[in-house]
Amino acid sequence: MEKITLAPISAVEGTINLPGSKSLSNRALLLAALAKGTTKVTNLLDSDDIRHMLNALKALGVRYQLSDDKTICEVEGLGGTFNIQDNLSLFLGNAGTAMRPLTAALCLKGKTESEIILTGEPRMKERPILHLVDALRQAGADIRYLENEGYPPLAIRNKGIKGGKVKIDGSISSQFLTALLMSAPLAENDTEIEIIGELVSKPYIDITLAMMRDFGVKVENHHYQKFQVKGNQSYISPNKYLVEGDASSASYFLAAGAIKGKVKVTGIGKNSIQGDRLFADVLEKMGAKITWGEDFIQAEHAELNGIDMDMNHIPDAAMTIATTALFSNGETVIRNIYNWRVKETDRLTAMATELRKVGAEVEEGEDFIHIQPLPLNQFKHANIETYNDHRIAMCFSLIALSNTPVTILDPKCTAKTFPTFFSEFEKICLRD
């Protein structure tokens, strides 16, 4: 297996131009495909998850031109639903941001009725989709499970989504609601969506609603408990759509600055629509010095203290707090993060396991993790298992800010969202 060893870093300094956001890139491509008119999507992320969406759209008859560096994509909108060739099968890797929204969009009524299969990597077949399928079926969709009940692969007939009253469980993933919201304007009737339980990751719903607005569709949001969407609408291309820098990817660089130097990230700022920008507020609460601009966030070292916090609203960036916690004074508790367990891997168990390898004292609960700080000279050199999970690889690069090297196994797994992560990270590292 490939691996990369990061030597101890004495300080960090510099500016990082962030790649486009994964969440925004895949939403933008799908909305542009369904919209009337041509959309030029700029600062698109070039990564595995985006490639899976682009390949799927091409197979569904969407025409687009991708620039040589793959960061600009001109999409010719269909002005409505997909034309599906019968017996088409789409392989979506482990891309939840492609699987979930496409599951809903492919249920919409096509010009001719046909069946399509959605499948992916073995891990995708372990990632639940029951709550989305249940909701779509209430709205009249025709979906079958091909292997295990509640999980991909799926067979979908494009008979249409009728709309009406739909209840959806919000407790596992906000992507289910995002998928339903994005397809609802193209349903035959108005849709009223009622959330069962507590809606997780609300800021991701804010992203969805803001982007739908950019493509000409308004949704009535009643305190995240009920959403009303008019049916029989069309998305209208805004002509150009700029994808913000990825706020989750920003977290590793900002944390490095907070631990041992000064780092600025550009492509995201105080007016960002991404919830993970709030990661900088968590660093500030821990003691770091944070500066916000229109198009940048900067983190500077100050003494860090542990924190006890509900991080349900920033589940991806919260992982970075788990490794940052080792460099603080006092214990850190990250709470209400059950949905770490249904991501690319079971992230709660994975983080606890790998943190212990570097010498940390950790307690893992059903939906929380307790982490004790570690003196710089007590870190152990470990081989970090990454579980084919890009975020684990990136989080554990911060361990090199101790006096000890860290070895990351399968570093190429960052290709899911940030193929050039390790070369970018090296740019800010200073060594004695």
UniProtKB/Swiss-Prot annotation:
Its EC number is 2.5.1.19. It is found in: Cytoplasm. It is an enzyme of class 2 (transferase). GO terms for cellular component: cytoplasm. The active site is at 316 (proton acceptor). 3-phosphoshikimate binds at residues 22-23, 27, 173-175, 201, 316, 339, 343. It comes from the Bacteria. InterPro entries: Enolpyruvate_Tfrase_dom, Enolpyruvate_Tfrase_sf, EPSP_synthase, EPSP_synthase_CS, RNA3'P_cycl/enolpyr_Trfase_a/b. Pathway: Metabolic intermediate biosynthesis; chorismate biosynthesis; chorismate from D-erythrose 4-phosphate and phosphoenolpyruvate: step 6/7. One of its GO terms (molecular function) is 3-phosphoshikimate 1-carboxyvinyltransferase activity. PROSITE patterns: EPSP_SYNTHASE_1 (PS00104), EPSP_SYNTHASE_2 (PS00885). One of its GO terms (biological process) is aromatic amino acid family biosynthetic process. Phosphoenolpyruvate binds at residues 22, 96, 127, 175, 347, 391, 416. It catalyses: 3-phosphoshikimate + phosphoenolpyruvate = 5-O-(1-carboxyvinyl)-3-phosphoshikimate + phosphate. Keywords: Amino-acid biosynthesis, Aromatic amino acid biosynthesis, Cytoplasm, Transferase. Gene3D superfamilies: Enolpyruvate transferase domain (3.65.10.10). Belongs to the EPSP synthase family. Monomer. PANTHER family: AROM/DEHYDROQUINATE SYNTHASE, PENTAFUNCTIONAL AROM POLYPEPTIDE. Catalyzes the transfer of the enolpyruvyl moiety of phosphoenolpyruvate (PEP) to the 5-hydroxyl of shikimate-3-phosphate (S3P) to produce enolpyruvyl shikimate-3-phosphate and inorganic phosphate. This is 3-phosphoshikimate 1-carboxyvinyltransferase. The gene is aroA.
